[in-house]
From Swiss-Prot:
It comes from the Archaea. Residues 1-60 are annotated as: Disordered. It comes from Halobacterium salinarum (strain ATCC 700922 / JCM 11081 / NRC-1) (Halobacterium halobium). Part of the 50S ribosomal subunit. This is Large ribosomal subunit protein uL15. The keyword Ribonucleoprotein applies. The keyword Ribosomal protein applies. The gene is rpl15. GO terms for molecular function: rRNA binding; structural constituent of ribosome. Binds to the 23S rRNA. GO terms for cellular component: cytosolic large ribosomal subunit. It holds the Pfam family Ribosomal_L27A. Residues 41-60 have a biased composition (Basic and acidic residues). Belongs to the universal ribosomal protein uL15 family. Residues 1-40 have a biased composition (Basic residues).
Length: 153
């Protein structure tokens, strides 16, 4: 065992120079983290937790869709089979309309703009303005079963 600790046995100062050299905090550059901005000691990491971590159950991926977007896209959605034409208007599932709608935790329909078609829209959530617009045109805002199951948990 020829490590430094073993080699220093019998030495009064263990390589620290004279017996006066290791006295006090001044020889060590201060106590604790003193002098960390002035001395050439880099990469001090701030230790400990900081900031706010949001609870995971409240951190949801929400995809949004406005009523006006739905209204403008109805002809295209009807042609592609996403919107189903019924006797009163159109039936649409918002998850099929939104990009990555099936990957999102929640698909919410927001009010905004104008609505000229009667729509039966199925989504996880609706803003009050969206419900007002949809039902104002004689349509129906249906909260999906998937959203109801999530609320029960």
């Amino acid at each position: 065992m020829t490590d430094k600790k073993r080699r220093q046995r019998g030495s009064r100062t263990h390589g620290g120079g004279t017996h006066k050299n290791r006295r006090g905090a001044g020889n060590r550059g201060g106590r604790g983290r003193a002098g960390r901005k002035k001395h050439e000691q880099h990469n001090y990491e701030d230790v400990g937790k900081s900031g706010f971590k949001r609870p995971e159950k409240t951190d949801r991926d929400v995809a949004v869709l406005s009523v006006q977007e739905l209204d403008e896209d109805i002809p295209v959605l009807s042609e592609s089979g996403v919107a189903e034409e019924t006797e009163f208007g159109y039936r649409v599932d918002a998850r099929d309309v939104v990009d990555d709608g099936w990957d999102a935790d929640v698909v919410k329909v927001l009010g905004g703009g104008q609505l000229y078609e009667q729509l039966e829209v199925t989504a996880d959530a609706f803003s009050d303005a969206a419900v007002e617009l949809i039902e104002g045109e004689g349509g129906d805002a249906v909260v999906s079963e998937r959203a109801s199951e999530d609320d029960e948990e």
